[in-house]
């Protein structure tokens, strides 16, 4: 479910759905304003911080769009996902600064731990390209919000979709509410009427995979 939300976030920013909804409030026909914003998802580089279960699903759902995936893990000991091709790669945090300048879309699916706090700080946000987008569906501690706001306001990055924040609910006076190129969800990326059914189905699948592996041993 979270993976579907991320796909929707990226498409909505890249294909102008969210920017159009914002600019239509001020302009009668903002076609010209969107001319320099719209980009294809196909052929882009998506960097996923946190290639665990959620990050794996995000990449799997994005791959059919013809993107290249780079996923960050704590170590390189585990095998790559079965949907990886020769253009995809796994890296660790020590290479993050090298990867960020190549990212068209940055997705954060990290747990909330001391190690992930402000992993995207002012310096790392500054490494992103002007057309880059950010999606955060992990935990709000992973992005330093003031430099994110500054980068969005100055249009040093194209836009961001955030489902999580450092303080939740988001305070009424939050500076993030001023950004016209930032779109927010109230920690709702996993909400669905069929969530419990899908959770049980996924658990059963993982249990079956584990049992099959044990039997092979």
Q: Whereabouts are the PLM-identified features?
A:
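Phosphate-binding beta-alpha-beta segment of Rossmann-like dinucleotide-binding domains, i.e.
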Residues: 1-45
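Hydrophobic "lid"/C-terminal helical patch
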Residues: 6, 10, 103, 152, ...
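Generic structural signal for small/hydrophobic residues in well-ordered secondary structure
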Residues: 6, 41, 46-50, 69, ...
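Glycine-rich adenosine-cofactor-binding loop
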Residues: 39-63
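Residues at the starts of beta-strands that form the adenosine-phosphate
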Residues: 45, 64-68, 181
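Conserved acidic E/D residue at the C-terminus of a beta-strand in Rossmann-like folds
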Residues: 73
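Rossmann-like adenosine-cofactor binding region
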Residues: 76-175
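Adenosine-phosphate binding glycine-rich loop
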Residues: 170-172, 178-201, 206-207, 211
């Amino acid at each position: 479910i979270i993976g579907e939300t991320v796909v929707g976030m990226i498409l909505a920013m890249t294909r102008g759905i969210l920017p159009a909804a914002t600019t239509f409030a001020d302009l009668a026909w903002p076609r010209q304003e969107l001319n320099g914003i719209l980009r294809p998802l196909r052929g882009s580089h998506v960097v996923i911080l946190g290639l665990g279960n959620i990050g794996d699903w995000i990449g799997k759902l994005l791959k059919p769009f013809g993107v290249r995936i780079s996923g960050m893990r704590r170590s390189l000991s585990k095998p790559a996902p079965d949907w990886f091709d020769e253009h995809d790669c796994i890296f660790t945090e020590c290479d993050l600064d090298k990867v960020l300048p190549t990212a068209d879309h940055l997705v954060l699916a990290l747990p909330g731990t001391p190690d992930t706090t402000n992993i995207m700080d002012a310096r790392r946000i500054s490494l992103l390209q002007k057309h880059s987008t950010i999606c955060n569906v992990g935990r709000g501690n992973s992005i330093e919000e003031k430099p994110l706001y500054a980068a969005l306001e100055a249009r040093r990055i194209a836009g961001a979709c955030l489902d999580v924040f450092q303080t939740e609910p988001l305070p009424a006076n939050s500076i993030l509410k001023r950004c016209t190129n930032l779109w927010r969800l109230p920690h709702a990326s996993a909400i669905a009427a069929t969530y419990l059914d899908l959770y049980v189905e996924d658990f059963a699948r993982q249990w079956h995979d584990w049992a099959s592996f044990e039997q092979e041993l």
